[in-house]
Amino acid sequence: MALIVQKYGGTSVGTTERIKNVAKRIARFQKEGHQLVIVVSAMTGETNRLIGLAKDIQASPDPRELDVVVSTGEQVTIGLLSMALMEQGLKARSYTGPQVRILTDNTHTKARILKIDEDRIRQDLDEGHVVVVAGFQGVDEAGNITTLGRGGSDTTGVALAAALHADECQIYTDVDGVYTTDPRIVPEARKLDRITFEEMLEMASLGSKVLQIRSVEFAGKYKVKLRVLSSFQEDGEGTLITVEEDSSMEQPIISGIAFNRDEAKLTVLGVPDRPGIAYQILGPIADANLDVDMIIQNVGHDGTTDFSFTVNRSEFDKARGVLEEVKAHIGAREVVGDKGICKVSAVGVGMRSHPGVASKMFRTLAEEGINIQMISTSEIKISVVLDEKYLELAVRVLHKAFELDHAN
């Protein structure tokens, strides 16, 4: 008998019929003797609908009250799924995040989990219940409802698995695992049987929508055995995400080609080249709670430098506004921006021991006439910023160049 945490996303529970199908799947697992904790998202589109209602009332909704509103989406799903499980003859009990004491900090709309009180869940499991928990939400020390941000249900599932020392955390989505790249761009893309936490973390940070990045961080930190599966397939092993030493003896050089369209570039031109200037630019950006990704500095011969960095496209206007205020203070000439960029990355733990990956990547892009605007590297990743019009071509040619359509 195993203790398994299963998480079902909004698409998986998007209709009452799909909720019934999920209940049938859960019933099969319980009949095999497993103890089950189920984490669910709101039904497809429900969170956006609730945010829309809030914005109809208040253009910039109060974060505390917005959390109260959007947390109701998961509450509907847990109740419906518990009823569906009862119809399958199972004992089921549903809980909101606050009810099971998923304790978070007080950062509304982007809270982080601090602690989970698992006693109530363990008692229900011992009594033979399937425990259904609302993802995406918790409660702070003062008793305020909090939410974890987009994709937070993945984090809830992994955090519960860590707290309960579950044998496995299964993330059910509308895809059957992690692929070498998006099959919609490269039909020959392969499903990976396994991938390391490091690789999955890079791919999640680079825009892969299979798993939310914080959930991968959590799983890696607490060594939670994580598996991605499709809720629309009866069979299939999905993709196992594991620590590197548990993976196959010889790693492939590259495991996947990831990409992100949600990128924009900002450049501060004519910046005085003096110590501390990077902090003077990026400090106010950080104070505005904006995330910076890639950074490049071009030093000129006239005592000035051009300072460029990338942000999420959705935060471009806010970041540009901050820079316009900074410009006069630091004596820069101009702020320019470009929303028409993308990021493409080659990811793989195997590149640690195989030189020449970067040169192969750059040569492949050059042969297609694709100009590289920015470059960033880590031990297991090489990322380039390109004109967005080249995204799909770049992904296809790199996938082919690294022979990812063939199993190693």
Walk through the language-model features, giving the residues of each.
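A conserved regulatory-domain signal marking ACT and ACT-like small-molecule sensing domains
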Residues: 57, 237-408
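Acidic-aromatic/histidine active-site loop/patch
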Residues: 219
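Short hydrophobic alpha-helical runs that function as membrane-insertion/retention elements
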Residues: 168-172, 226-228, 293, 374
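Glycine-rich beta-alpha junction loops
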Residues: 43, 175-177, 222-226, 230-235, ...
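Residue-level detector of flexible, active-site-proximal loop/helix-junction positions
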Residues: 99, 233, 379
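Short phosphate-binding/catalytic loops that engage adenosine nucleotides
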Residues: 34, 90, 224, 290, ...
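Nucleotide/pyrophosphate-binding catalytic subdomain
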Residues: 1-216, 298, 310, 386-387, ...
